[in-house]
A protein has these predicted regions:
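ATP-dependent adenylation/pyrophosphate-handling site
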Residues: 37-48, 52-90
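Metal-dependent de-N-acetylase/amidase catalytic core
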Residues: 2-44, 65, 87-90, 97, ...
Length: 266
């Protein structure tokens, strides 16, 4: 029973909460669709697929407007549910190739993507090295905007990357970039603190004209969205979870101040 609640019932509850809570959250959102496309950006993704789930339409909209977009994928995704017929090294290669394919569908070239290849789930163990590599990229690219996973997400890599993005902003006071966080594993009420929710400056970018291609880019992550090896115990992201990223808009939290901290890990 406990296993059922953890694997099935509670995720379904969170997905239902997203259906109800998302409109309430977005009722006070600022539509930045007309403002953001022309601005260059750096997208920081904790794992292969986060860039597409969280920012796919925004990336396409920027590229269509002629803006420069770079994507950095921080970890190798090795600890996502892995088919037993694949070794860890083979699975890492699959995930990286899927990222290249998905980003190509979004319109990015291979040169636009950087893989840092830190071990999935262990980004916090390499915080200083990750920060230094990201700082070098920021100094080289100097993007007008930075997009990163939400500091409220229920995954340590997502939070560490968000914390690093905030640290980097403080290290570059003379060359500031607007910082936006995109929620992935956000709809878990155990993570929410009223103060944090009230402090969120919520922004949206509409997906008009880009939703079909975003769906194709998500589908390129076959190891994540399908039981692509056909194994009996194969796992895939839940359809209810994926639907959150194929609605009318993409959701972002603009970081005005780095004061908000990560909630306790679950």
């Amino acid at each position: 029973m406990r296993n059922f609640l953890r694997r099935r019932a509670y995720p379904a509850f969170c997905e239902s909460l997203a259906v109800v809570g998302r409109p309430l959250l977005l009722s006070r959102a600022v539509d930045v669709t007309s403002q953001t496309p022309a601005r260059s950006c750096l997208v920081l993704a904790p794992h292969p697929d986060d860039e597409t789930l969280g920012c796919g339409a925004t990336i396409m909209r920027k590229l269509a407007a002629g803006a420069s977009v770079r994507v950095v994928i921080a970890t190798d995704g090795r600890h996502s549910p892995r088919p037993s017929m694949l070794s860890i090294d083979a699975f890492v290669k699959v995930r990286e190739e899927e990222a290249r394919r998905a980003c190509a569908i979004l319109g990015l070239s291979a040169e636009d993507i950087t893989f840092l290849r830190f071990e999935d789930g262990r980004l916090g163990d390499h915080r200083r090295l990750a920060r230094d590599r990201l700082l070098d990229l920021l100094e080289t690219i100097n993007p007008e905007e930075v997009f990163v996973s939400s500091i409220i997400d229920n995954h340590p890599d997502h939070r560490v990357l968000a914390e690093l993005a905030r640290e980097l902003g403080q290290l570059r006071p003379d060359r500031p970039s607007r910082l936006y966080e995109y929620p992935i594993w956000f709809w878990d009420p155990r993570l929410w603190r009223v103060r944090d929710l009230l402090e969120l400056r919520i922004c949206i970018v509409r997906m008009d004209g880009f939703r079909v291609r975003k769906r194709k880019a998500i589908a390129a992550y076959r190891s994540q969205v399908t039981n692509f090896t056909g194994e009996r115990d194969g796992a895939a992201l839940r359809r209810g979870f994926l639907r959150q990223f194929l609605g009318p808009e993409e959701t972002f939290f603009e970081v005005i101040s780095p004061r908000m901290k990560s909630p306790p890990y679950l």
